[in-house]
């Protein structure tokens, strides 16, 4: 995004920090589901939420890990494991990278759409107001761009 043309709310949605936070939430929710099914210990899912929620994801550190692993999600999971500890072994079980990436993209699109739809509602209200304000304003007729 070009900063001078971007609104802070949109920049925040598409920032690496937000992307990694969403990735964490997707992984943690998946762990909740696995715990509910008895696949992983409930205590592990709880620990993942507690320690992962408190984590400050370091974009530069994740990028550095990715340069070695050549895989964005593996780099993130490696970084996340530093915060979670031994229970990190339960994260990403039965998932593929696409499960995380596609779901994250859908979340980001939804958040961005919410902003756009609110703005469009404001634009439509302004257009309606102007249309009624000028409904009796005389204008020069035009045909094929000629007065």
Where do the PLM segments sit?
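A helix-coil-helix interface module used to build multimeric assemblies
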Residues: 1-147
